[in-house]
Amino acid sequence: MDADDGREDRFAVRVAAGAGTSDAVVVLALRGELDHDTVGPLGGALDDHPRARRVVVDCSGLTFCDSTGLNELLRARLRLRETGGRLDLAGLRPPVERMFEITGAVRVFRVYGDLTEALADEAGPRDGEEVHG
């Protein structure tokens, strides 16, 4: 059995349709379990959009996220901040949201109830403000 067997079934990242053509706003839709074994595609998708001014990560299909996944999102957030961009989260489901609450990460990211709400907020709150839908 190859080391990659089953990983694609457990986790997927796709650039959501309608995210814009300028690459200024990129929507990454996550599905499945984000952990040490599956984090590679997320890192690759984030690296594929270096000119993005805003990345919205749609977590509505994310069923699990461990510390490796959280750290990848935190690193991407810092990289975007260095260039004046931002990374926002949308649609956290209860098990994933609980992990973000326990670690305090929910206070670091802008978190929206769903993707529609996140995309409607073009300006967004100032850093440090929480957004929960």
Where are these regions (language model features)?
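STAS-typified acidic loop motif
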Residues: 2-44
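Residues that form or immediately flank small-molecule/cofactor binding pockets and catalytic motifs
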Residues: 18, 94, 116
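Short, charged, intrinsically disordered terminal tails
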Residues: 7-10, 113-133
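Intrinsically disordered, low-complexity regulatory regions of eukaryotic regulatory proteins
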Residues: 2-7, 56, 64, 127
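Alpha-helix termini
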Residues: 21, 80, 125-129
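Amphipathic alpha-helical interaction surfaces in cytosolic regulatory modules
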Residues: 36-109
